[in-house]
UniProtKB/Swiss-Prot annotation:
Mg(2+) binds at D9, D11, D179. Disruption phenotype: No visible phenotype. NCBIfam families: DKMTPPase-SF, HAD-SF-IB. This is Thiamine phosphate phosphatase-like protein. It comes from Arabidopsis thaliana (Mouse-ear cress). Its EC number is 3.1.3.100.
Amino acid sequence: MAKIVILFDFDRTLIDGDSDNWVVTEMGLTEIFHQLRFTLPWNRLMDRMMMELQSQGRSIDDIKSCLKKMPIDSHIIEAIKSAKSSGCDLKIVSDANQFFIEKILEHHDLVDCFSEIYTNPTSLDDNGNLRILPYHSDALPPHSCNLCPSNLCKGLVMDHLRASSSNDQIPRRFIYLGDGGGDFCPTLKLRECDFVMPRTNYPLWKKISDNPLLIKAEVKEWSSAEEQQRILLQLVSTITKEEDS
């Protein structure tokens, strides 16, 4: 039987909204965010927003409280727990950040469902302030992918996962769920036995629609949390039956 690995993007896929935008809006940073929007790469812009919160006297507990209000649709929660209980290996590959993702998942009792989270790391500085760092450290040579932002190439993450499973006695089959342009690079790494689930009318879906001959995986689009749940669990069931037969 193949091991089913499910890779979730986070923003606008696992959650319906965007965790960065949620914090910016809920914590009153909209004005300064738009002032700086096109002066910094997104990852560094969000780090700058954390410094702005510090200057306003906001604490890390204030950020935690904000993140706890971020909803996750009940259909997604049910899908995650069902896939986990079915023996799937669930991972997150996201251009959000470690702190935001973990606090949202913890609040919804989901963090233990995921074996790994590949995202931009976070740390606390000497003053106890949250800092957001790039996944691909500035200390390392830049990746050469022109499809992805400089701070995170999801295709390299997929290469790592593929390489780490090369000696497995049990083959892996991947299901990749995403919405953004940054999800196109890992989609190109999927094989004929894998599946990609793009969100309808979002950038990943549009890139796949414009470049169908580049995609080896079977495409299963979704447009709502309920549809995502239904299709994902159907795929898990189908793969399991195929491998058991």
